[in-house]
């Protein structure tokens, strides 16, 4: 087992594709990505470093049944964390959003995931500058940085590889 676990929630498959790209770039440092609806808390907790991906749905929701998805996802998983401690875990988020279609809650689905994990003691890393995006509001901002890597596969797909490479270099410097 590698030291880095990659987990994702998805509705359209775009987040899964990014998770696979991350795995390809990390190679043996990370295990193959797993959809969060296909894992257990024990499997999740087995990794000291977690890279977690989520899209933003509707008005800023995480994927899951309450957001209209056909299967469980992040919404249900974080509800099941209950009193689990993530102390000693290092976590970085990557989020997908559509800044033109949803400018009022761009990548806001990252916020509930960030809050749930940090409240349970996780060391959150991998924030990302908000420069180069055009949106009105996002709850995923802390100052002028997002709580994780932000990718817009709808409008800026041509920037994904460069953003991903830069973010992963920062992650590797922090955890290796």
Curated annotation (Swiss-Prot):
Top-level taxon: Bacteria
One Gene Ontology molecular-function label: electron transfer activity
Pfam entry (one): Flavodoxin_1
Domain Flavodoxin-like: 4-172
SUPFAM superfamilies for the chain: Flavoproteins (SSF52218)
UniProt entry keywords in alphabetical sequence: Electron transport, Flavoprotein, FMN, Nitrogen fixation, Transport
InterPro entries assigned to the protein according to its UniProt record, in alphabetical order: Flavdoxin-like, Flavodoxin, Flavodoxin/NO_synth, Flavodoxin_CS, Flavodoxin_lc, Flavoprotein-like_sf
Stated family: Belongs to the flavodoxin family.
Record's protein name: Flavodoxin
Organism: Klebsiella pneumoniae
């Amino acid at each position: 087992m590698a030291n880095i676990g990659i987990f994702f929630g998805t509705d359209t498959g775009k987040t899964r594709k990014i998770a696979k790209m991350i795995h390809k770039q990390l190679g043996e440092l990370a295990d193959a990505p797993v959809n969060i609806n296909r894992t257990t808390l024990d499997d999740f907790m087995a990794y000291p470093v977690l890279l977690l991906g989520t899209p933003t749905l509707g008005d800023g929701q995480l994927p899951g049944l309450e957001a209209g998805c056909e299967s469980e996802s992040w919404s249900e998983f974080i509800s099941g964390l209950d009193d689990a401690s993530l102390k000693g875990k290092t976590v970085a988020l990557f989020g997908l959003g559509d800044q033109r279609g949803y400018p009022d809650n761009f990548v806001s689905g990252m916020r509930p995931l960030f809050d749930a994990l940090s409240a349970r003691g996780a060391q959150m890393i991998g924030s990302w500058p908000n420069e180069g995006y055009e949106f009105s509001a996002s709850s995923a901002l802390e100052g002028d940085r997002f709580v994780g890597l932000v990718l817009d596969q709808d409008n800026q797909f041509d920037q994904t590889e460069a953003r991903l490479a830069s973010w992963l270099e920062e992650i590797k410097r922090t955890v290796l």
